[in-house]
Design a protein with these regions (language model features):
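Short, mixed-charge, low-aromatic patches
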Residues: 26-33, 154-163, 213-219
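Active-site nucleotide/adenylate-binding loops and adjacent lid/helix of ATP-dependent enzymes
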Residues: 2-148, 197-201
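Extended, charge-rich helix/loop segments that form flexible
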Residues: 126-187
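ATP-dependent carboxylate activation and anion-phosphoryl transfer catalytic cores
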Residues: 103, 111-118, 122, 159, ...
Length: 247
């Protein structure tokens, strides 16, 4: 449908939302590493570098601010999409808000199994550190499942041109699975009751602007119980809700 194709064009979505007064991470499409660094400097602070038509976090670098990091991230992102976007980094947590019509019906905080590089440790070491968390176990009895370096994780790494022995640069986010399923080391927490009314209204506006009756609005912010104005953050993506597409 038209609405779904709008939702797939991330830049168009962002422009529509910005025009409607919804907070979004501003950014620009860049053609080369020099361009990427120039835009990064103009945005100030930290940036995200990602392929324009990428999905599922492939070729994405978050929270980087040094010139060499930005240039390296550009060359990685370029392998996954024709164009590369540099945008303002929004610190915070990932939330998925489910909007049906005029109402926010559910919200969850989502954390896929991932490690953040420190420029020193290998991916295997970083995973081992995370798995030491007493909340993580091997079954369903614990709050979180240990992150598994299984075939899917290895394949996910290969897609990012990495192995378990790779040492990711400082701040590079390495996703070990492309989803936040609890059973595979991701985590999701129901926060429906906590969403601030202004933030819920922003999500509904976002869905309306894109023209989807049922959609998942992905939000990044520090706290879901405060409006965007108080903390920065904003809507990073609008998706036709998985499993609920209207054909």
């Amino acid at each position: 449908s038209g609405a779904e194709s709008i939702a797939q064009d991330k830049e168009l979505t962002k422009e529509l939302l910005h025009a409607a007064g919804v907070s979004v991470p501003m950014g620009h499409v860049v053609d080369n590493p020099d361009d990427a660094w120039r835009v990064a400097q103009s945005l100030g602070k930290s940036v995200v570098v990602k392929p324009k038509d990428g999905n599922q976090g492939k070729g994405v670098a978050v929270n980087i601010h040094l010139e060499e990091q930005v240039r390296m991230a550009f060359s990685v992102a370029q392998q996954y999409g024709s164009k590369v976007i540099v945008e303002r980094y929004m610190p915070g947590q990932d939330f998925r808000l489910l909007v049906v019509g005029d109402a926010l019906v559910a919200a969850a905080r989502r954390d896929p199994p991932q490690v953040i590089g420190d420029g020193v440790h290998s991916i295997k070491d970083l995973v081992d550190q995370i798995n030491l968390d007493p909340l993580r176990g091997d079954g369903h009895a614990t709050a979180l499942t240990k992150i598994r370096l299984d075939e899917i994780a290895l394949a996910t790494l290969v897609k990012q041109n990495l192995t378990i022995d790779s040492i990711p640069i400082q701040g590079a986010r390495v996703v070990l699975r492309n989803n936040a399923n609890l059973s595979t080391g991701g985590s999701a927490t129901d926060v429906t009751e906590d969403v601030h009314p202004d933030l819920a209204a922003s999500a509904v506006t976002a869905a309306k602007m894109v023209g989807l009756d049922i959609c998942g609005v992905d939000v990044v912010c520090e706290d879901i119980y405060r409006p965007f104005e108080d903390q920065g953050g904003g809507v990073v993506e609008v998706n036709a809700a998985p499993g609920l597409r209207m054909h």
